[in-house]
Amino acid sequence: GFGNVDPTACHGSAHPKKLGEDGVGFVVKEGEGEEETEISVEEVAVRHLKRLRQSAADYLGREVGSAVLTVPSDFTEEQKSAVSKAASKAGLEIIQTIHEPVAALLAHDAKLLQSGEGDESKHDKIVLVADLGGIRSDIAVIASRGGIYTTLATAHDYELGGSTLDKVLIEYAAKEFFKKNKSAGDPRENARSVAKLTLEAEAVRKALSIGQNASFSIESLIDGRDFTLAVPRTRYELLANKVFASFTRFIEAAVQKAELDILDIDTILLTGGTSHTPKIAANLQSHFPSTTTIIAPSNSPTATNPSELAVRGAAIQASLISEFEKEDIESSTEAVVTVTPHTHHPIGIVLGNDNFAVIVPADTPVPARRTAQIPVPAGGDVLIRLAEGMREIKVTKAEKAATNGIKDADDSDEDSDEEDEEVRERVFKSKKVLAEAGIKGVKKGGKVEVQVNVQADLSVSLVCREVGGKGGVRGTIEKAQGMNGSAK
């Protein structure tokens, strides 16, 4: 009811109004006479979904009766139910709801598969999906293990988005107008002028996402005076520097919430309309290590339009489950199916010099099977040590370039007081040996194949054999002997 509504998220738009005893809605102006009409939140959703259904029907040339719907990752079951109810009134049967970041990642992986990079979509990787919208931003850190997605953490900011960047442009344009037209007054104090500036600022921001220059051009901004202002991208990026830094901090905070380091992130997938902004991707590129791939239109020409990623993912999911019975779909999304045990630590083998090679990464849903091959250049007997490992961040000081004691003319004493640059790298170490297995008489230059199977009860079976050889070694380690796991 209205008493449970938090109106703070609406401060920049229409404010909710109490309808009837406890209903929630808005007052809108409709028709040529702009008569005020009360309309409930449900009716707003119904009208919107009807419009979407009709647009889809016009494009496909046939009626649309069911759909997969994407929702924010912080949607409650009550909110999902309310949206499904509104969809039903709009003539749509919602066969499944999926979270927007998962839908976006599904669309991205499907494109990799379609482009011939199918194996890439199945790699074990940590993906951060940053959904940067017009009025809010949402982050999800997802572990992709063999094509199965596990959400490790989510973060939400209801104040950070494209409109935040628009405000920077509005402030700049208003000040520039007032400098030259003081007698006309400050346009920020006139509601109609603010509306014109807001509309134009959004257009300028979008133009600066694809070009180096854009211009404000507003007829009769205030007191009948027209206004034009050229805005170079460099000027825009300087003005909005603090906002761009906020996006980077927000994304890094989500990584920390997942109890990870930025070195753990393999891919950052930018989605949402504001992701078109080149400076956001550039800042992430400089802040994250070179091993992290940033997927955005500005640095990846083949990237899918970020405004369409989530909806493409929903369409792909719909095509996958459209032939299933509704009861089967519902049963497959029950907690007993979706909440499964995961490995808490990586499992791998201990190599020479106590180096640890990961075979089954942390946060892998089980049951799971992984295989690795170990080269044996010298041949002979080989000892395989299966262990549970741990990830550490190793920090070292970068060596300064040798100068032979000779200073350049530009060098100062202050430079010598600067701290050495830190070099951070991710290393894996053995934490607990789970089992040992020996392979005798491996040929010189041969390979040993190690297959690790983690069962649903977190027991581990190990199979070792020489590639091309006969026989092998196999065994099972019960969970009680040292395996750690967690349900997610």
Where are these regions (language model features)?
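Intrinsically disordered, low-complexity, Ser/Thr/Glu/Asp/Lys/Arg-enriched terminal regions and linkers
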Residues: 21-26, 305
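Membrane-embedded glycan transfer/ligation machinery
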Residues: 46
